[in-house]
Regions:
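Short glycine-rich anion-binding loops that position phosphate/pyrophosphate groups of nucleotides
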Residues: 44-46, 182-183, 204-207, 239-240, ...
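Non-catalytic positions within long, well-ordered alpha-helices that form the structural scaffold/packing
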Residues: 53-58, 169, 191, 365
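Short internal beta-strands
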Residues: 62-68, 233-237, 375-376, 399-406
Length: 492
């Protein structure tokens, strides 16, 4: 593709060279530099890749995109264009490179602090029940037409995102559904993407710190950007941050929740439990009247299902598809039951901060188990506040806790557990817990010491398939490990 075609819609200045330059592909990793490629120089939080421009030129790249002035003497024969924001430019250039695939599909984006992944899966289930062919991108990875790929970020970098949209379209997808993180919005990963429907789940403090957002207000503001980029916004009317988040929205709004003004309103729900089922049934009124049963527990499942229901109605899907899609949806690693015993219930969940842990335990406590047991750790090289917070919440809300590892990365598990213990002691000095550093041993302990009617929540990893020790990732699939152990000891 000619550089001129690649730059369509991008404000730029040609510094040197020609717009007739032929470009085979776009890169933003200097290690991939090769003849025929265009290298985008990005100013990152840790490093500025403009420093690698000369090295890329020496490796034969055909063109460079820069955000600030650099020494051109080392770039003979290389076309150079200057833009105001290289991240923004890369997003639009990537869309052009792959033929603007997002314009040829129904686009749905979901944002919020909690519930993005579950809501996205519920929407996917509803769409597929209606016969739609869906490509989905989010925390759990990329799914389309029976295929699955892992992704490093909830919202992939713009080049990977546009490439994925192209793969969706080529595979026959008519709808692209994705989680849209505040980081993805702030870092222009979704720049140039317009959504038919944007969804807001809820908002609470998270992702605030070095390399993320400076303040909660900034975090909220970036979340709100989605509703300047969609035709219809499906939003949680009950969240206290909704009004501020939508302050400058440009889309039509459809609301859901319990407020009497909600377009789709839940007016009563019932908790459902057996040893291998935790769910909820609820009644919907407002613009439609419907009874819904969801194969996931608790109040937050009601909200997630309401969001998916509202999206289905906005898109004109049949009520039967909405009902069936919600009824059969199961999300890997999100309150995911592992039915290994009729004596107790054990589940996996991705809850990995204070807010999500409190929400989960509040939900599980409502099912009135004999004991609520939590198996958890906290990630290494991450904020200690999460450790104190999760420890405090579990001490207050669980009957028994098993403290163990999560992804230690480059920290000692004993140091991480010590921080969690500090939070436990603050939350409840009389809290009952045990410390088992190895997570596999912790899983075995939970099973071996389970009592009749217990509800055991193994939290923090959820859908993850590995554990990270000293930067080395090794396979660790909690569902399989629990099933194997149950079979090994002859559990019934």
């Amino acid at each position: 593709m000619k550089l001129e075609q690649l730059m369509e819609g991008v404000p730029f200045t040609l510094v040197q060279g020609s717009l007739d330059t032929e470009i085979a592909d776009i890169i933003y990793d200097s290690r991939k530099a090769a003849p025929g490629l265009l290298f985008v120089c990005i100013v990152g939080t840790q490093r500025d890749s403009h420093a690698f421009a000369a090295d890329c030129a020496a490796k034969g790249v055909s063109a460079l995109v820069i955000q600030h002035d650099i020494d051109l003497s080392a770039l003979p024969g290389v076309t150079v264009v200057k833009v105001e924001s290289s991240r923004y430019a890369m997003a639009l250039m990537s869309a052009n490179l792959f033929g603007n695939p997002a314009r040829q599909m129904t686009m749905i984006g979901v944002t919020g602090t909690k519930g993005k992944t579950t809501t996205t899966h519920m929407i996917k289930s509803v769409l597929e029940a209606a016969g739609r062919k869906v490509g989905m991108i989010g925390t759990n990875g990329i799914y389309y037409m029976g295929r699955h790929k892992d992704t490093a970020n909830t919202t992939p970098e713009s080049y990977e995102l546009q490439k994925t949209f192209r793969e969706f379209l080529d595979a026959g997808c008519d709808t692209a559904l994705m989680e849209v993180s505040s980081q993805g919005l702030m870092m222009d990963r979704v720049a140039g993407v317009h959504y038919d429907v944007g969804v807001f789940t809820n908002l609470s403090p998270d992702h605030i710190g070095p390399g993320e957002h400076k303040t909660f207000e900034e975090y909220r503001s970036w979340k709100g950007q989605l509703f300047k980029r969609c035709d219809v916004g499906v939003v949680n009317i009950d969240d206290e941050n909704t009004a501020a988040l939508l302050e400058s929205h440009t889309c039509k709004l459809v609301t859901y929740g319990r407020d009497e003004k909600a377009d789709y309103r839940e007016t009563g729900y019932e908790l459902l439990r057996t040893h291998d089922f935790l769910g909820v049934a609820f009644h919907v009124t407002g613009k439609d009247v419907m009874d819904v049963k969801v194969n996931m527990p608790g109040e937050f499942s009601v909200y997630n299902a309401l969001a998916a229901l509202a999206v289905g109605k906005v898109l004109g899907l049949p009520d039967a598809a909405i009902h069936d899609g919600l009824g059969k949806c199961v999300v890997k690693g999100r309150v995911e039951l592992v039915p290994i015993s009729k004596k107790f219930t054990i589940l996996l969940d991705y809850a990995h901060n204070e807010v999500s842990t409190e929400s989960l335990l509040t939900t599980l406590r409502a099912y009135k188990p004999h004991r609520l047991v939590v198996v958890f750790g906290c990630g290494g090289n991450r904020s200690k506040l999460r450790r104190y917070g999760m420890g405090e919440i579990c001490a207050k809300m669980a009957d028994f806790s098993i403290l163990t590892e999560d992804n230690n990365r480059f920290e000692k598990v004993e140091d991480i557990i010590a921080d969690i213990r500090e939070g436990m002691n603050k939350g409840n000095p009389d809290a009952k817990f045990v410390e088992i550093p190895d997570r596999l041993d912790a899983l075995h302990y939970a099973v071996d010491h389970a009592q009749e009617g217990d509800l055991i929540a193994v939290i923090g990893k959820g859908h993850e398939t590995y554990r990270d020790r000293e930067g080395v990732k090794t396979p660790f699939l909690e569902r399989e490990l629990l099933e194997e152990y149950a079979q090994q000891i002859g559990l019934e």
